[in-house]
Amino acid sequence: MTRIVAISDTHGKHHYLYGNIPDGDILIHTGDFSLQGNAFDTAQFFTWIGRQKHKHKIVIAGNHDLIMENLSAEEVASMVPAGVTYLNDSGCEVEGLKFWGSPVQPTFFNWAFNRDRGPKIRKHWDLIPNGIDVLLTHGPCYGIVDGAPDYIDYSIGLKHTEPKHVGCRDLREAIHRIKPTLHICGHVHSAYGDDVNNGTTFINASICNEEYELVNKPYLLDISGKSVEIDRTL
């Protein structure tokens, strides 16, 4: 059994989590570790996560992590400390588990890693190989842990007052193909929570709420084979 600690969307407030990050084998952050995505905030985050006591740390970027989109592989390598794996449409194997991580999400204002729905974003999901145990994406798939209340749809000039599913349909199709044991995401702060669908456990690990307040707890996930148990004692 491997214990995963999952967090997302800390938006530069990771320092306030000292003492609140539980022990585990793997610490995962699924993006938006900064607020404005500048070099200083990004470097501070990687220093912080590199100091965490978990044996393995895996990170993907999110739409707020602007600087990460244009860094070369060499620049990323110089920023990411030992013991931390940064995934960008790429994978790794840790503790016998196969991971794949991608920062892209359907176009959302003028942020980083935007891809239009349809063929442009689908080509990223097509990169995900079969046999992945744990899929990490910044944004959720459509219809699962993706409800956004008071969602403003600028394309038609309407503000929705009921929860609206804003996740990616193409990602959901990819997940149906891949059938990972676990999918961890963030991005939609209001959709913090978990669900199980078609044998996959889905986690939205957003720590911040819509007001960027640290209100949610990290997820503790025990994974063994195709089984995932959520430890809710934290």
Residues of each region from the PLM?
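Binuclear metal-dependent phosphoesterase catalytic core
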Residues: 91-95, 170-182, 189-234
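Core catalytic region of metal-dependent phosphoesterases/phosphodiesterases
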Residues: 7, 12-94
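Charged helix-capping and loop-helix junction motifs
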Residues: 42-46, 73-77, 116-121, 164-171
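Extreme N-terminal starter segment of soluble prokaryotic enzymes
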Residues: 1-4
